């Protein structure tokens, strides 16, 4: 039996895995990266819109800093995130942007003077300062106070992935693709690597290491309609679950992106709306201002997705053979802007829908027939233009994943996890656009460093016989799938699983339908034990891969559905129509799913409390819908009083915002990442003789005063 030894084993070759591999090589470790596909084909490349980091370079970004990025991230998560992790993230993100620039990422840059833009559906002129010429530009994204999303046109993930992959090659990281991880090797609650199948030859071997880091991405493919690549089936997270030790966090927290192309499901980046694109119904009306007067199309993703579906349910969706949808109008931006800044969107729309989204020519006025006369709140009807893109919400991102602590350590010692595969828990119950590729790189930096330090100190304490036993177990299972007498067809089971998840565990959830989904998923899981593969070869066999992966996917589907059924509240992307309020009194916690015994047919669910008394910002009104639509935590007022007292005391002592923040909620982070981020406007504040950052203390004070006055509810 073949066994390969190394110091650091990284499973997954996207942004998080590759960046972590660089951290390992920088410490002199023998590092191997295993990837299902050539690493430049990883799903990280599909990210279009940008990466959030509070640089505050551009006109519309002035005044931005870590505090505002932190506040947006916490509010976006619907107070479901780990606030210490959010602080680690926002502090490191500006450093990550500049590191990527030094590695060759061609960030779109500021050009001094006037530039045209579309803001809130109106054509405006933005004047960039002469002294900011050449600095990194940022665009608007949903759920943010400032324009914070740095970008390279609409191919940000692609350029980032190529730069990080090149840097990994520069450091001579051993990257091996077409490798499929089947199971983790573990003994006495410690992980020592993985059993791996070569997709081309079918050979099953072991990679034994001092430390293992999982970075295999999300689990979107358990749904039928998703923007995710075919490799995003969550098999890595499921393998962690199958150890019986590692746990999955917040699996019911599934994001549905508002603007997926109909019918293909390919993402139409949030940059379309960030740059000024609008959503229209079948009558051509811009309907989002009626639902979200402040943020409109740039409300958080979970909010926009719900509003689109609510509007469609009212009968205002455009008809198509693939179901009702609404329109995304970016022709309003002008052809020059679309072809320069949204060229990938244009290519995708033309290739997969036959639509030139820059075409503002009138196609028909027939769509305006029957427009209600008594609904001025939805705006004016408009003739259908040729360039409008058909879109509707589809599964997009996995907030849940393998539960880790802030250092990336899972419940299984020696196993780390980073990126979308992890529940680090930066995103809570809703992720902000632009925080995903940002998290992938930042987690690769922070967790990669902690992982490398672990590998430097750890020892391999497992004998060859135990490793060979893991190899044999996987070999026997492959033989069973190829030669058992079962009659079940893998594709029939997989397709029905996806349909159940789409139909009953989607944007809107309800107890009875979740119970129905759970029952059917259990039946499918039982059937998956009797799958027999028709193609009998071990090598180059996609049917075999689907067979062993489908059983893992069903375990994840059960975790998602069980978590959604038990969580009797609505929080972020988890919307229960039978429990419409966010309930901080009962549900300010994190769901943990485990599978301690292979004989189980359902996950074990437990909960991890989020401690209000350790939060920098206590749970409050998120800013969408009715103000009273949440049940406050009983300790909220006590924590608010503590926060206010601390701010007032430190302000009297002349402390700046960073010192105030540290007093409110200390967090651990490597010194090189925790160092202060300097911005151009910092020097201007100093030049005026003002107290650096003091204006943010007042802003925070105003916020907490409002909380104490009861302005967080009606």
Curated annotation (Swiss-Prot):
The modification Tele-8alpha-FAD histidine is found at residue 43. The keyword ATP-binding does not apply. FAD binds at residues 13-16, 42-44, 49-50, 420, 436-437. SUPFAM superfamilies: FAD/NAD(P)-binding domain, Succinate dehydrogenase/fumarate reductase flavoprotein C-terminal domain, Succinate dehydrogenase/fumarate reductase flavoprotein, catalytic domain. Transmembrane segments: none annotated. It is found in: Cell inner membrane. Its cofactor is FAD. Keywords: Cell inner membrane, Cell membrane, Electron transport, FAD, Flavoprotein, Membrane, Oxidoreductase, Transport. The keyword Cytoplasm does not apply. GO terms for cellular component: plasma membrane. The active site is at 257, 273. GO terms for molecular function: electron transfer activity; flavin adenine dinucleotide binding; succinate dehydrogenase (quinone) activity; succinate dehydrogenase activity. It catalyses: a quinone + succinate = fumarate + a quinol. One of its GO terms (biological process) is anaerobic respiration. Its main location: membrane. It comes from the Bacteria. Part of an enzyme complex containing three subunits: a flavoprotein (frdA), an iron-sulfur protein (frdB), and diheme cytochrome b (frdC). Belongs to the FAD-dependent oxidoreductase 2 family. FRD/SDH subfamily. This is Fumarate reductase flavoprotein subunit. It comes from Helicobacter pylori (strain ATCC 700392 / 26695).
